[in-house]
Amino acid sequence: MKIRISLNILAKFLDSFAHLLFLKNKEIYTPRKEQAACVEVLERYFQANPENGRFLMNCKMRFGKCFTLYSYAQKNNINKILILTFVPAVEESLKDDLNHIEKNYKFYTDDDLQKSNFDLKNQNEPYVVFLSLQNVLGKQRIDGAKTDFDKERISKLQEIDFDLIVFDEYHYGANKKRTQIKVEKVNKKIDNPEQQDNQDDAEEELASTFKLKDIKSKFQFSYKQLVCLSGTPFSSLRNNEFSSKDQVFTYSYFDEQKAKSAENHPLKLGQYGIFPEMNIYCFELAEIFTAQEQEIFITPGKGKNKLPEISFRKLFQTENVSKESSKPVYRFVNENLVEKLIDSLIDKRKGFSHTPLSWENIDKHKHSLLILPTRVACFALANLLKNHWYFENNDFQIINMSESQFGNGKKALIELNKHLDEAKKTNKNTLTITVAKLTIGITVKEWSTVFFLKDLKGAESYFQTIFRIQTPYIKNCKNLKEICYVYDFNMYRCLEVTNEYSKQTQTDPKFSASWFQNLDKFLPIYLVRGDEIQKTDPEILQKYEYFIMDKRAFSTRWMDESNIIDIDVLCNVGQDEDAQKILKKILAHKKFKSSKKKREFEDVHLEKSPKSEAFSEGVRSGKDYAAEQGNVLEELENFWNFNQALEQKAKAEFQQKNFDDNEWNNYKKGFNFGVNKHFEDKVSIKKIVQNKIKDFKKRKGRTTSTFKKWKWLYFWWE
């Protein structure tokens, strides 16, 4: 006896069977404390704003924003969820997050909406509908008009009263214009890589479609609650799009790293131990290129506050050297400069003491991402590296994501993972070259390093890109990525976007000095300048904030060779105003160079000041004390204890005099002046310091801490 089953019934049976397998393979997660806190904030906000409320989750990449949102939906009996995104490649990760909550949600995509027999209104089980905004806008275009299919798709969504609409990667769309044009650019198939450069720009800046208030007027979707997800919603925050504090939950990279530091599990990986620490290295390109070579891609700053402009588009400018127009072959116009840059990252003898791609360091950077300004530059660099002796002989696989086989979105991610899997089987290193593809919202756990060689100034895109490498990578219970690395070749850009990120992700309304301490501890920034590496410390970062309107002064101070000193020394001196004053006086500060000025200065205090007697006595005591100390050179070498001795000696002498306590400052000034006067009369301090520097250069090299100390003394003398 034969039993006939209709195709529709069979399809439903297979769908139910697949769903049962899905439920069996679930691995339920317990929300971390910050995720649970976010759920509570969401509950409070939407209880106070039950209709058409809107909320922003300003949480770092890898926070688990969608899992947190699913946890909130499960707890509050939210059954009809629509997720809209500009990054179709995140589909799998959003679907996978449903595996980690107890409630069973169906997951529908655009493929389901295309089925003629699919009716979302008749779905009784809780569900999540995932759509890219490109699809909602309509990617099948005829002269810019929506097709009947597009209208039908949108009409299906308009029939539903959604409990919750979610905008994923919302930074893409915060109040941007010309979106429709950009969407059409992205969806248009282009075979010519030179024309594709414009498409990449459109894809990177593709910004959602509208302001939140325009949702109903544009799509006429009905919803009770709306949540925007982003790790970098800086434009929205600057524009006060979410004006109430109750509308925003913030969790930053610094919050995560502080939790990791407090966890302190020496023998096992804790909840936060899996998240890599990020280190940023800024390479000073002027160290490896001649002045003539720099003119090609570096424009000197003009005016008081102007910085040099670095153009990576000019550095990586290309030309087509193929005689066949149908088969273009690209190479760099300034190929010798590009080769010089690549060689400097491989061989210490070619410019930089830190060489991330050298054989001894490559294990830290086994799978790297390299960001370039144009698609044609990607083709030119891929060709160059494949014929480079180092990459040819050391088992490197060069992956050019601008090749047509990668496509866009989900297809590109699948193709990339295929290449990475092949490389891992043969233990090869990989270098993935791209302009913007797969730099937003996606997860590639193998990437541990990013080289930033692109003209990009926005903090949103910059941090979205570099946080691709901060994805945890655990294999066989072993943490394969404890630290991840960012290599930037534009110091000014790096400091500016880092400053912006720090401001926009802090929860304390006051941008305090302690925040700079967090930046220094959890996101260290190093300047690589020839054979020296200098770590920025909190004081330098504060100086950057101070010099934000006068960056020329800051960049000169940071890059000055004389500023390469021990961090503890800089912090100690920088935090003590009296120490700075004493230091300047001991080193014959220019204020005291002219004997005439010195006499005038002394006369002013001795004759016109109402406390001149205390000052005069201090001068005499200071001279006597300096004379007792003997060799001035020994005093300079022991200066770091000497300034404290000055303070103690002056205090002891003052207490023996018959002065009022309120005259202490005048006495101390006079004492310091007397010490300085004795040293100036006794010896040329500038000559001592110069000779000492020359001696260290000849005998002990430029890297000893003592040499750096003398360089710094000379810096202050000047």
UniProtKB/Swiss-Prot annotation:
InterPro entries (alphabetical): Helicase/UvrB_N, P-loop_NTPase
Origin: domain of life: Bacteria
Pfam families hit by this protein: ResIII
An example molecular function term from Gene Ontology annotations: DNA binding
Xref: Gene3D superfamilies: P-loop containing nucleotide triphosphate hydrolases
Purpose of the protein: Corresponds to the C-terminus of a putative G subtype type II restriction/methylase subunit.
Protein name stated in the entry: Putative type II restriction enzyme and methyltransferase RM.MpnORF110P C-terminus
Species whose genome carries this gene: Mycoplasma pneumoniae (strain ATCC 29342 / M129 / Subtype 1) (Mycoplasmoides pneumoniae)
Organism phylogeny: Bacteria, Bacillati, Mycoplasmatota, Mycoplasmoidales, Mycoplasmoidaceae
